């Protein structure tokens, strides 16, 4: 089911979307697929699949370790897309590919767009591609998810709105991804600023890890992105792989209950 329909259904039920970020094929392909199935079973609504990259500037310490882990395993954009096709065959979640721009540029925009369509990718996030350059990929017929930050000007917010995206990824704080405390009132004011310009659903990410954070932004954001918190579970249970999917499922269930 594609992203817009899923988000519309959740909005009708007055539920927030739970968007899970997981690095493609880490620790290995089969275990990663088991983890993704567990996330789906636990109530995850959309899946964000990361492509390992050598210089992940937008990512914090935890996710950066997963990028380097994937690079050591020889993972790249082509293998990430091959794995995305396996994910598409294994689960029904709308699938968002998260990739930095340099690997896309090296692959070539035409080939990248075609391979995304072949793999069943529903949308793409490119965190280091400026909003005013997203048109390079939009012209390839891809669904692009723009990212905004609390520092985004009204003109940047309007630029994101003009893309008519399936949703806007609202970075919760200045800086990189990671588990942290969040300035609740500042974030709510920021979301309202975006809401005044765009009718697109808003997904809040960077720092969401606890059920109380999901509860705090219910009614303000249309979805939350969980990444570093899941990555920490994967790190903790890597040596006990039989337990890992179940722990991810439990975390998703706990977060989804409050969405």
From Swiss-Prot:
Question: Is this entry keyworded Lyase?
Answer: yes
Q: Name one GO molecular function term.
A: tryptophan synthase activity
* Gene3D superfamilies hit by this protein: Aldolase class I
Q: Which residues, if any, are the signal sequence?
A: none
Q: Which reaction does it catalyse?
A: (1S,2R)-1-C-(indol-3-yl)glycerol 3-phosphate + L-serine = D-glyceraldehyde 3-phosphate + L-tryptophan + H2O
Query: What EC numbers are recorded for this enzyme?
Result: 4.2.1.20
Q: Name one GO cellular component term.
A: cytosol
Q: Where is the active site?
A: 48, 59
Give the main EC class: lyase
CDD domains attached to this UniProt entry: Tryptophan_synthase_alpha
Q: In which pathway does it act?
A: Amino-acid biosynthesis; L-tryptophan biosynthesis; L-tryptophan from chorismate: step 5/5
Write out the entry's keywords from A to Z: Amino-acid biosynthesis, Aromatic amino acid biosynthesis, Lyase, Tryptophan biosynthesis
Which InterPro entries does the annotation name? Answer: Aldolase_TIM, RibuloseP-bd_barrel, Trp_synthase_alpha_AS, Trp_synthase_suA
Under PANTHER family, the record lists:
TRYPTOPHAN SYNTHASE ALPHA CHAIN, CHLOROPLASTIC, TRYPTOPHAN SYNTHASE, ALPHA CHAIN
- Function of the molecule: The alpha subunit is responsible for the aldol cleavage of indoleglycerol phosphate to indole and glyceraldehyde 3-phosphate.
What HAMAP family does the entry give? Trp_synth_alpha
Family classification: Belongs to the TrpA family.
Describe its partners and assembly state. Tetramer of two alpha and two beta chains.
The protein here is known as Tryptophan synthase alpha chain
């Amino acid at each position: 089911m594609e992203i817009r329909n899923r988000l519309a259904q959740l909005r009708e039920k007055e539920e927030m979307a739970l968007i899970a970020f997981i690095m493609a094929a880490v620790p290995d392909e089969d275990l990663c697929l088991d983890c993704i199935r567990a996330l789906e079973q636990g109530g995850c609504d959309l899946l964000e699949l990361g492509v390992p990259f050598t210089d992940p500037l937008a990512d914090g310490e935890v996710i950066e370790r997963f990028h380097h882990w994937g690079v050591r395993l020889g993972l790249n954009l082509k293998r990430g897309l091959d794995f995305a096709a396996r994910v598409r065959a294994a689960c029904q979640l709308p699938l968002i590919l998260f990739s930095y721009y340099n690997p896309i540029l090296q692959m070539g925009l035409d080939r990248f767009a075609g391979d995304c369509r072949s793999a069943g990718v529903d949308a793409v996030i490119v965190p280091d591609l400026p909003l005013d350059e997203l048109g390079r990929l939009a012209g390839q017929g891809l669904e692009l998810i723009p990212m905004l930050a609390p520092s985004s000007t009204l003109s940047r917010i309007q630029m994101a709105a003009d893309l008519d995206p399936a949703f806007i990824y609202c970075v919760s704080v200045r800086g990189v991804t990671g588990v942290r405390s969040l300035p609740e009132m500042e974030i709510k004011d920021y979301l309202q600023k975006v809401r005044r310009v765009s009718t697109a659903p808003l997904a809040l990410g960077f720092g969401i890890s606890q059920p109380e954070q999901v509860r705090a932004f219910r009614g303000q954001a249309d979805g939350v992105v969980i990444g570093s918190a899941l990555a920490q579970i994967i790190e903790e249970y890597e040596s006990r792989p039989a337990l890992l999917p179940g722990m991810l499922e439990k975390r998703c269930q706990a977060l989804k209950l409050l969405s």
